Structures are given as structure tokens and as C-alpha cells.
Amino acid sequence: MRRTLLAALAASLLFAAAASAHHSYGAYFEDQTVSIEGTIESIHFANPHVTFNLRTDAGEVYAAEWQNLIQLRHGNVGSTTLKAGDRVVVVASPPRDPSSRKITLLREIRRPADGWLWRRTTRQ
């Protein structure tokens, strides 16, 4: 009985640490923003987060991690809202590593062609 309890406690602590690391934003400057304009190369609507690749005119490819499906659906974003080929402007917190091409703390996405706009209302 005691071993089972200790095993359960250890497992819950490991899970808590993993969840905390998953949502750690220490690699980003949360108090700053950058604007990146480009074309969506691919987009994947699946949990835990919707992801897409964004190619700039300079040929740089950024891997973007958006919110989860439920959060996006509450914001009226569905699997057909954005698609490969859409030109967008992404406003996000920049990574502390200037060579990083990963953007996670998305604050805003605009599609200039039709004026569509998404703004973050909750923390990812």
C-alpha cells in the first residue's frame, strides 16, 4: 500500500514538472513584441497546439505554435480559417535566442487580404 502511494505521488510530481516545462515562456521576452510577415506554408490543426510554418519574403521559415483547438474555437477560429498560401502578419513575443525561428507567444495574426484578425485573449 505504501509503495503504491509513493509511486502515485512520484508520478504526479513528474507530470506536474512536465506540464510546467511545457508552458514555460522563459525563452521569450514577454514584455516585447515583433511583427513577422509571410506566407503560411503548412498548418496543422491538432492538440496540444495548432502549429504552422511561416515563410518570409527573405526565405526564413518560422515554426509557430498557436493556441489549442478549444481556445481557438472559442475565438471563432476553425480548421478552414487559415490555410497554406495565406499571407499573414504575426505579432508575437520574440525569443531570447536571436537565431531561433520558433514563435510561441502569439499575440495577434492579421490577414491583410481581407482584414481578418485574431487577437490572443488568454495565455497560451
Question: Could you describe each region identified by the protein language model?
Answer:
Residues A16-A18:
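N-terminal signal peptide c-region/cleavage motif recognized by signal peptidases
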Residues M1-A8:
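Bacterial N-terminal signal peptides that target proteins for export
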Residues G38-I40:
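Conserved hydrophobic positions within beta-strands
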Residues A58-L69:
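A short macromolecule-binding patch
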Residues S20-V34, N47:
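Transition segments tied to proteolytic processing and entry into folded domains
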Residues P95-T122:
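OB-fold/S1-family single-stranded nucleic acid-binding modules
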Residues A46-R55:
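Short aromatic-glycine-enriched beta-strand elements
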Residues H74-V90:
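Short nucleic-acid-contacting surface segments enriched for D/E, G, S/T with interspersed K/R
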